Amino acid sequence: MMRTTEDFHKPSATLNSNTATKGRYIYLEAFLEGGAPWGFTLKGGLEHGEPLIISKVEEGGKADTLSSKLQAGDEVVHINEVTLSSSRKEAVSLVKGSYKTLRLVVRRDVCTDPGHADTGASNFVSPEHLTSGPQHRKAAWSGGVKLRLKHRRSEPAGRPHSWHTTKSGEKQPDASMMQISQGMIGPPWHQSYHSSSSTSDLSNYDHAYLRRSPDQCSSQGSMESLEPSGAYPPCHLSPAKSTGSIDQLSHFHNKRDSAYSSFSTSSSILEYPHPGISGRERSGSMDNTSARGGLLEGMRQADIRYVKTVYDTRRGVSAEYEVNSSALLLQGREARASANGQGYDKWSNIPRGKGVPPPSWSQQCPSSLETATDNLPPKVGAPLPPARSDSYAAFRHRERPSSWSSLDQKRLCRPQANSLGSLKSPFIEEQLHTVLEKSPENSPPVKPKHNYTQKAQPGQPLLPTSIYPVPSLEPHFAQVPQPSVSSNGMLYPALAKESGYIAPQGACNKMATIDENGNQNGSGRPGFAFCQPLEHDLLSPVEKKPEATAKYVPSKVHFCSVPENEEDASLKRHLTPPQGNSPHSNERKSTHSNKPSSHPHSLKCPQAQAWQAGEDKRSSRLSEPWEGDFQEDHNANLWRRLEREGLGQSLSGNFGKTKSAFSSLQNIPESLRRHSSLELGRGTQEGYPGGRPTCAVNTKAEDPGRKAAPDLGSHLDRQVSYPRPEGRTGASASFNSTDPSPEEPPAPSHPHTSSLGRRGPGPGSASALQGFQYGKPHCSVLEKVSKFEQREQGSQRPSVGGSGFGHNYRPHRTVSTSSTSGNDFEETKAHIRFSESAEPLGNGEQHFKNGELKLEEASRQPCGQQLSGGASDSGRGPQRPDARLLRSQSTFQLSSEPEREPEWRDRPGSPESPLLDAPFSRAYRNSIKDAQSRVLGATSFRRRDLELGAPVASRSWRPRPSSAHVGLRSPEASASASPHTPRERHSVTPAEGDLARPVPPAARRGARRRLTPEQKKRSYSEPEKMNEVGIVEEAEPAPLGPQRNGMRFPESSVADRRRLFERDGKACSTLSLSGPELKQFQQSALADYIQRKTGKRPTSAAGCSLQEPGPLRERAQSAYLQPGPAALEGSGLASASSLSSLREPSLQPRREATLLPATVAETQQAPRDRSSSFAGGRRLGERRRGDLLSGANGGTRGTQRGDETPREPSSWGARAGKSMSAEDLLERSDVLAGPVHVRSRSSPATADKRQDVLLGQDSGFGLVKDPCYLAGPGSRSLSCSERGQEEMLPLFHHLTPRWGGSGCKAIGDSSVPSECPGTLDHQRQASRTPCPRPPLAGTQGLVTDTRAAPLTPIGTPLPSAIPSGYCSQDGQTGRQPLPPYTPAMMHRSNGHTLTQPPGPRGCEGDGPEHGVEEGTRKRVSLPQWPPPSRAKWAHAAREDSLPEESSAPDFANLKHYQKQQSLPSLCSTSDPDTPLGAPSTPGRISLRISESVLRDSPPPHEDYEDEVFVRDPHPKATSSPTFEPLPPPPPPPPSQETPVYSMDDFPPPPPHTVCEAQLDSEDPEGPRPSFNKLSKVTIARERHMPGAAHVVGSQTLASRLQTSIKGSEAESTPPSFMSVHAQLAGSLGGQPAPIQTQSLSHDPVSGTQGLEKKVSPDPQKSSEDIRTEALAKEIVHQDKSLADILDPDSRLKTTMDLMEGLFPRDVNLLKENSVKRKAIQRTVSSSGCEGKRNEDKEAVSMLVNCPAYYSVSAPKAELLNKIKEMPAEVNEEEEQADVNEKKAELIGSLTHKLETLQEAKGSLLTDIKLNNALGEEVEALISELCKPNEFDKYRMFIGDLDKVVNLLLSLSGRLARVENVLSGLGEDASNEERSSLYEKRKILAGQHEDARELKENLDRRERVVLGILANYLSEEQLQDYQHFVKMKSTLLIEQRKLDDKIKLGQEQVKCLLESLPSDFIPKAGALALPPNLTSEPIPAGGCTFSGIFPTLTSPL
């Protein structure tokens, strides 16, 4: 370039013509100020195989106003002092990352076009020029560039994550391409010091530069926001932040994103830079790492000011300049030049190193390393940035805090500190793996990433730098390593893993760095690179040893001296990084210098340093608040990394343990692993030290502690659990002992075997093995396990092969990484979790040991684990490709691992490394593509798809039930089992924690990142708080405490975790079923179940009852439900076997899905509810975990659980969405198929339902089940505001506890244990019993006890009260009381529930057994307590609760009333009605928002369940009789859809009354008069505290209704209210009519009619209604042609039937709506005569009820039924004349009803206008408060809401029509017609299912939007928004219903008119016809209804 580095560094105000004209090129520097737009356009780039040139300069733009204008054709060489790799993406990201200023250096071909002539060549010439100008720069750039190029080459492999990268990856073989692709970012750093830096140079490395680099990176500030990526450099976090989860995944491989990487990396580097290389190197090398790190890095780079660590060849010093990317650009350019010249030489090696990280890392074989060394001497100087590592410690602490820390630390670090820091312990304990996995894959990892350092990516190199260069590793390790480990070290391994190519890039850089000073590479990309290098070292003892020892060691040394050095290096790395960090550049440089010569330790030191760097980072991380925790993570991760990369030693000596642990690590997806490495990996990389750093970190006496055997042991133990004692002391000692070269030589001697051999053979390895318990035996076990896993997981675990390959190259870390890429990370996470769980349990050592075996077994089972087996790694080298593919499968894994593998692969042949890299890139890219497609497939939240390891998980899941693997995901469980088995078993016992571990990997594997604003805010990638909720640690329940405490992980990678859980759980859950298969399976099972139980196959049943299968099933399987269940199951149901037994084949997947979601929910919820319900929940979760451990582990409990679970799976599984509760189980014990109910609603419905159910019905149960009651009910209550986010959380939470709590997990709750024996057993019995609910009730009791006990003493009594009858009987009551006990519930209930419910519950206290009996009895005769309880709950929730309570007991038919209440509540809970099962399901989804309150009422849900499944016996028996006798008692709040059930049980109070009462009930303080506002508030509140509000609504409503219905019914039931009530009745009565029909003796019509009459006219029908019914019956009896239309049969489907599950009719919403309407119509109603009013009510109710969609025909249907029974007394003539008269009379009556309906429609339109006005207000408010992108999300959501609702209505109407026609087809219908109809139905059904999925997606978006708005809006405003949204869909549906009813009425009138003789003149005179019919001539003759009816019915 024309300017020296310094010059370049200097800001230039103008386009400098200071052009270095070299040859035909002149370099111009343009300094643009003012911010974007900059006024020029870039085109070409590596991605397109063209030079990156300025295609056009906009006139008048900033670029056009320069003195020396930029010209089209100018090739952009540097941006912000970052040497470009010619990647357009990188350039774009750099430009975008520029804040106020943009510094460009362009090369202009003076000979040809000024701009582009030989841009490509020029690029490389440029570096020379640039280099030549500033020689040091040249060297640095050359080296860096070369490295970068090399890395770039490799990078494509890693980069493939991004599609662009993939493209470039294909071109990667070209060194220059590589250079461009990879050199782009990372290389600059690497090259920076690579060519210019020397070991000694590093000594000159200016820490200040490193330190200040973060600050210096002005870009960093902006990128800092992106930094979260920085936080997750290894993970594709940056991309998550910057681009997307896929990009993030790609970011590893996106060198085109290199700019992002550069930013990210730069930022990272700047932050992590200490380990850095030269400033430039740092930015470059780090960048490379970062680049590998992915967009994350790129983002960071943008955010970061690049510290150009320029190694001044002349000065022999590496100076760190804040290049603002310019240095990087220069470096890149030089790198390019170098790449052409020396760069290529180095690249030949380095490319291999990069392309073939192994060679690169291994020093790319001796030659590569040596060449790297030779070429990289300057670069070695760059490694001085290890000094940076020294400064890294400070830097990491300081710098990171400055840049990464300042922003990321605050944003990521702190969140991570909180997330990772706090999470760290928990994370390490339980969530570390999760976080790691997530962090790499998810933005959430951003925080975790950040925790382990996004910046650490650049820092990762820093880590290696710290790792390898830090001679005074031990001294500084305590401080620096931690940061290195934490951010960089971990990151590095993650990076290395993350990108085989990254590693290559890092390897290249690091290789170059490390090659020169093994450490430097570590610095550049030490952690990651060094990991690989270590393996490479292992692979190439010769080159590796010499260079590893000298330079390569640092990064490779980690592996290099895997056995001895690794251990020692590990320790040293732990310690050395501090050295590196402390010494900073000098020390590091000296270390680098020394390393080659002075450190035998050098080799081991570099390795140790790498380890130490990791540990150092960890240490420093420890130093940082968050670091302490994180260090543990890192230790675990580093340990993993060590195991992976450095585990050679670990694997060798400690490898038995380490390997076990590592194996688990391996099992963790490579990506995860990388991330793990980043997060855990830092610790893991530190390997044992890192893993131990958990201890070491915790000890923070890192140097001594970490260095000390204990530290390592700790880390190892942490990682491996069992090695904890030995690993800690022994392993640590091993590391130290083994660190010596003795092992290293062996390792080097056998690269693959050596790596393993090293791991195994080295003393360190031996020690490690000893420490691990399994030295070589472990390896053999690993091998065996690997074989097992291979066999088991087959191709799924190719990752194992890949791991094996990785293991060979990066056998320890990489292989493990690769192998465990999916599993390893999971395992690592699991390990960490186990460690966390075990450690927290205090059995870390033992656990680890046990876990190791188990992990070995399990891990080994997964290929990843096999990979862990060092020996098997070598043997599996060939499998690597598979592993790579497998790894690829795991997107994250693929990203990291494959790259790594190629590196390792290349390692064998240093020169071929690039080639390998290219193929690897392709293979990797293919893998990535596969993974991406999977991820995309998983976008449906189907973890199954996502779970690359998930399938294994599924497989493993099965074994898991039998083994302790349950806790862990199959990959993790199996793979992780071996290393983590102890933990796993440990976890298994506390299944939750265990599962949580597996789950997190799944989530990560899922690679689907959902980011919520909060998540982004918190740095965890998913927008769904659900992710947070599903914070995905099943373990979270138990480790919830830690995890929630260390929620960093969950928070940071909540989405990932959720995904992990979902995916893993889902995989486990589904076992071998694919998502779709499982979905279908579940749907079918649910449908079958419903069909069996109800006699009718719900159309939506699959989607409705089995909504889980439908929208939900996907959802369930998606993170929310499926994964949760799996996780929950594994975790919640500690005993895998019992879990397995518990699970029914069909239900099992669903249930797992349910469980996992619960787990996920819990985990995810943790962050969400962390402040309130989380704290309690977390503790509870922990307790619960303990309980689970004690209880779940307990054979009885386990067995019981097993017994119970099978049923529970049925009822529960089906009910996952419903959040089955003990009550549910009890209620539905007879219909155990209940599981079909599991997810009646789609994700939203399920989430809501679950939430509500958990809160309400299952609330008690959920409480028990939910590790955190708070999470359950509390979360639920919180969920109203956080509903969207929390909703799922609670659901998951609840599901988790609920799952476990179902019969086991709930018991597993801390409080459950005590009550567990009796209650649980009872529960289980109940569960097994045909009455699943009572058991659930018992569980609820337990739950209450568990949740409440931990939370409140009352909880215990409550549980006892609630457990059986209460809960089961009044799912709502039980649940409601329980939820109150949960913090959220309590808050929701205002504590009243807590206090009040106990009484009722106390009564019910005998409940567990009573619950079973009661639950059973409940069907027969619901005990009074539930209603009172419910009332009490309502009381608790509301002040009205007492009246409610008193009134509830007042009900004579309390049972019925309760049932009614329960049913209605249930209905609400389960959406309008589960009986509506199928139709209800979809409604349920929508209802879930509004319905959540409804659902909250457990009774309704429970009743509903009863109704659906037990409904036939119960409703018919109680319903029918109750219906009529009970008509007087008002049903529970109509809003809860009580009407339907009320009708079933007894006639519901007038809709108005009911609604009014409900409103009042719902609004404790809201008086009836304020219905409009109240309804709105109620709805909001409903959402807020679905259980309480709803319960209140139900009970209070019921009580009030009872008391006031009679008095106020007449006067207060206006048509609109009626209409609402009627609607409820309709949804419950009409839509559930079929159910009613089945349930009630009366067919739906009569039931509906009765409901209508009872509802509208109060218990008494208006005379007109009665007359209409009688007329209809008589007419139908006499004129069968009109039977269909006049007697709407339940068999006829209506639009509402099909809409039922999707948009659960929120009675509250309707209530609100009706309230408004009521207010409007009240005058009309009251003004009207009583008869008229009754008529109106009837009409409205009919309208609302639309019994069979025909509101008008509701009474008629009843009449028709009666008519059928009426004897034909009159002779035909008389009959005919009489019939005609009756028809005329009926026409008049129908006409009147139509008028009423028209009035109702008018009021509805008014409501719609009002709601739209409200929506406009809300929108205006939101537009002012929210960010534009958030506002866009809101607008898009609202717009899509309309579209989706209308689409569903349209499709539902068409489908209903077709189905009605089909059902009406006679036997004479032609096959052609029938087949045509079937085809239409099939098509429509498919479209409807798609629309339902859209609805699910919409529900997810709704939660996201709600989460966003919750941050801006006040509670009242939020309630307005929620009310608006709920009412929007509700009003649309109601409008359609009214239209359908009106249409039906008109059709009925029309048919009646047509059936009348043309000459007929009614005696009463002319017929009063509806306006639209008056003009129509009345055709003579009868109209065949059959022909018309289907048509009529269909719209209805």
Curated annotation (Swiss-Prot):
Gene3D superfamilies per record: 2.30.42.10, 6.10.250.3120
Signal peptide residue numbers: none
Ranges of biased composition (kind: Polar residues): 814-823, 862-871, 887-896, 1366-1375, 1459-1472, 1634-1649
GO CC aspect terms: adherens junction; apical junction complex; apical plasma membrane; cortical actin cytoskeleton; cytoskeleton; microtubule
Region span, Disordered: 150-173, 340-389, 437-468, 568-629, 673-772, 788-1053, 1093-1115, 1137-1223, 1315-1573, 1627-1665
All copies of domain ASD2, residue ranges: 1669-1957
Membrane topology: Peripheral membrane protein
Bias kind Pro residues: ranges: 1524-1536
Domain called PDZ: residue spans: 25-110
Localization per record: Cell junction, Adherens junction; Cytoplasm, Cytoskeleton; Apical cell membrane
GO MF terms held by the record: actin filament binding
InterPro entries per record: ASD1_dom, ASD2_dom, PDZ, PDZ_sf, Shroom_fam
CDD domains xref list: PDZ_shroom2_3_4-like (cd06750)
One Pfam family matching this protein: ASD2
Positions of post-translational Phosphoserine modification: S213, S439, S443, S816, S890, S910, S913, S970, S1069, S1072, S1221, S1441
Keywords carried by this UniProt record: Actin-binding, Cell junction, Cell membrane, Cell shape, Cytoplasm, Cytoskeleton, Developmental protein, Membrane, Microtubule, Phosphoprotein
Family stated for the protein in its record: Belongs to the shroom family.
Function per UniProt: Controls cell shape changes in the neuroepithelium during neural tube closure. Induces apical constriction in epithelial cells by promoting the apical accumulation of F-actin and myosin II, and probably by bundling stress fibers. Induces apicobasal cell elongation by redistributing gamma-tubulin and directing the assembly of robust apicobasal microtubule arrays.
Stored PANTHER family: APICAL PROTEIN/SHROOM-RELATED, PROTEIN SHROOM3
Name of the protein in its database record: Protein Shroom3
Organism of this sequence: Homo sapiens (Human)
